[in-house]
Amino acid sequence: GGVILVGGSAVGRGSVIGAGSRIDGCVIFDGVTIEPGATVQDSIIASGATIGANTRIDGCVVGEGARIGTRCELKGGMRVWPGVEIPDSGVRFSPDA
């Protein structure tokens, strides 16, 4: 399917959002890759970050160049620092990674 972009979301130049993804109330900076089936809500995704397929992110900040693996779940105001990698199937609720 297509991409669902709602809630006043903004997407920067050169960003790629995969099929079946939902972006709601987010700021997506330049050069971000969001793989198919991801859901990103009320979050900020910094330049060059990658969000893996079928990952759910809610209320988080993902730093520049960070990589979130496939089938991950991040929520609760979590901050992923620049360049950090969260492995596939990771579930994080703590404030910092």
Show the residue positions of the predicted features.
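Left-handed beta-helix
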Residues: 1-97
